[in-house]
Structure formats: structure tokens, C-alpha cells
């Protein structure tokens, strides 16, 4: 893009846990979806990684806010501040003036008109001149390398931070889908609850996330067992420091109730799939995307439950962002993009 380029094109995966921005086919921003605001002055103290480092460690003057909950905007003002700040992180590449922004943003497939409007308004207030929307399962399918326009059935399960999106896709459209509010954030809460109830220890959200990444599992028996994860925190009864060694077996137990809900949602969508498309899915398998796809043994668990092979998309954390980037390059071709 030259010095006088009038438009900058951005693909944005506005996630509950992380926001990823793609420009010119490259990931230019990958930050936690969180802002830190000064309560007295209203000044933005930090956005993204710096704000996450403050999360759970602030004093009363500074508040950290996660603007999205369950995949949708929960705090409009904070969402706008965050989006504006993250867009500023995208380099202007030597342009002489700020270009107008063309954006494609992904949204949960179960979004209401009000929720879609909130995303659009946030994007426009943050500088978006042309704003398009794409449903997350469609973006996940594109990011997983599937031909979404083909006359055959493809199925994706995208387990993000706020929602799990399950969809059957054919001929550039979503044939049937289900969106449930059981995903990464709920897994994190499950871990906090388990450690509190079973080990009498309080841990914060960040520590629970670290446990999830290190030893989070969907099966109590794995072929490759990860090393136990050590945690330090206060004992609830004594307030004295204690050290725990957490195994993946424990985490499989802690997450079981939530995983059963995801199992059920997948079965519900499979029941809705027309027979001809079902045959395609049984042959091609189902694709897993999102951070939840990284739970150890999840693909095997789901394959055993459904008798259908499950494939983890390449770099599942960024699959939705990649797909949104592909949609951005093909705005005029893909009829499923919404204005």
C-alpha cells in the first residue's frame, strides 16, 4: 500500500478472550480482550497484554474490564475504547494521513439483531467506514481450509472464550447451527471451583488459565501424559500459603460437566443435518477450532462419542481470524458477508 492509499482493510476476530487483527494477510495484533481504566479520570491505563497483567492486581482507582462476555459486547464503552486502541496498534505503513477503514468482523452465529448492532456501532465509532460481518463458524471453516461454497456438507466446532459454535455448512451458507455459552471462560471457572472445593485453595482467573493451558484435558487417560502443574496460593481455612501439584486427570474430572454440554450440542446439530450432508460429514470428519480445541484428548473424546473423525485445524487459536482474513480478501465474492 502506498503513501496515498485511501483505504486500510482489517479483518478482526473480536473474541471474548483475545482479539486478533489481520492486515495485508498478516496478523498484526494479537492481544487479550481487556482494558484497564482509571476510575477517577476515565483515562485508559492499558489495553491488551498490559491490561491483562494488571487483571486481579489493581487498586480501587484502576478497574480492568473485559468488554465481551459470552461472545457478545457486554460493555459498549469499554469495547469501543479497546477496539480503537487495538486498531491504533496497526502500523500506518508510512501513509501521509489516516486511511478510512474497511473491516470484516466475526460474530457468534446466535447473535441477536441488538448484539450485531452493538458490534457494528463499536466498529464504526472506532473508525470503521465500511463494516462487514461474518458468522464465526463460517470464518472457522474458511480458516480450517474448507471449501465453504462446495455442494457438500462440512461441519465445524469452534470453542472460543465465550461461546462454542457448532455448524453444518454447505453452498456458502449455514444449514444448521447451535451456539452455547460453554467455552474457555467456563472451563476456567470450572478449574477455580474445583481447586477451591477439592483443595481448599483460592486461585485467580489468570492462574486457572495457566492450569488449563498446561494440563487441561478432556480424557482421564491420555497416550502422551503432560507433566503435573505446580500452583501456589492461599489455603482458604488457614490463609497460609500452600503448594499444589495438579494433574491432567484431575482437570478432566473438573471439566467433565461442561464437556458433556458440548457433547450434547454437537449431537443436537448432527440430528438436524440433512441425510445427504450427513454422509459428507461422516466421510470428511468434523473440524475443531478455537482455543478449546487445544484441550488434550478432546478430538479423541468427540470421535469416540460420535463415531465420526475429528480434525484439529492448523493453529486453532487463529483459525477464525484467518478465515475472517480470507473473507476480507473476497468481499465481493462471498455472498454470506453481512453489511
Where in the sequence are the language-model features?
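Nucleotide/phosphate-binding catalytic cleft detector across ATP-hydrolyzing
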Residues: 1-159, 167-286, 293-339
Amino acid at each position: 500500500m502506498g503513501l496515498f492509499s485511501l483505504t486500510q482493510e482489517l479483518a478482526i476476530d473480536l473474541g471474548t478472550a483475545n482479539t486478533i487483527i489481520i492486515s495485508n494477510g498478516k496478523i498484526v495484533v494479537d492481544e487479550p480482550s481487556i482494558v484497564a481504566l482509571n476510575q477517577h479520570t476515565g483515562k485508559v491505563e492499558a489495553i491488551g497484554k498490559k491490561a491483562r497483567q494488571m487483571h486481579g492486581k489493581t487498586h480501587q482507582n484502576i478497574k480492568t474490564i473485559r468488554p465481551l462476555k459470552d461472545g457478545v459486547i457486554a460493555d459498549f464503552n469499554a469495547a469501543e475504547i479497546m477496539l480503537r486502541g487495538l486498531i491504533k496498534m496497526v502500523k500506518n505503513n508510512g501513509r501521509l494521513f489516516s486511511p478510512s477503514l474497511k473491516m470484516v468482523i466475526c460474530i457468534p452465529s446466535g447473535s441477536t439483531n441488538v448484539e450485531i448492532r452493538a458490534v457494528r456501532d463499536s466498529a464504526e465509532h472506532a473508525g470503521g467506514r465500511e463494516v462487514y460481518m461474518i458468522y464465526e463458524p463460517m470464518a472457522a471453516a474458511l480458516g480450517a481450509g474448507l471449501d465453504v461454497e462446495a455442494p457438500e456438507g462440512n461441519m465445524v466446532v469452534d470453542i472460543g472464550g465465550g461461546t462454542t459454535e457448532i455448524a453444518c455448512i454447505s453452498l456458502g451458507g449455514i444449514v444448521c447451527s447451535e451456539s452455547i455459552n460453554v467455552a474457555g471462560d467456563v472451563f476456567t471457572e470450572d478449574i477455580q471451583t474445583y481447586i477451591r472445593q477439592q483443595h481448599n485453595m483460592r486461585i485467580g482467573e489468570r492462574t486457572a488459565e495457566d492450569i488449563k493451558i498446561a494440563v487441561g484435558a478432556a480424557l482421564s487417560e491420555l497416550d502422551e501424559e503432560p507433566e503435573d502443574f505446580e500452583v501456589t496460593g492461599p489455603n482458604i481455612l488457614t490463609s497460609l500459603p500452600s503448594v499444589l501439584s495438579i494433574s491432567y486427570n484431575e482437570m478432566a474430572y473438573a471439566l467433565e460437566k461442561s464437556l458433556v454440554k458440548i457433547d450434547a450440542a454437537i449431537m443436537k446439530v448432527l440430528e438436524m443435518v440433512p441425510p445427504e450432508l450427513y454422509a459428507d460429514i461422516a466421510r470428511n470428519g468434523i473440524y475443531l477450532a478455537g482455543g478449546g480445541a487445544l484441550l488434550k484428548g478432546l478430538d479423541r473424546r468427540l470421535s469416540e462419542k460420535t463415531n465420526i473423525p475429528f480434525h484439529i485445524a492448523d493453529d486453532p487459536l487463529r483459525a477464525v481470524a484467518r478465515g475472517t482474513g480470507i473473507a476480507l480478501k473476497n468481499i465481493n465474492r462471498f455472498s454470506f458477508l453481512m453489511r
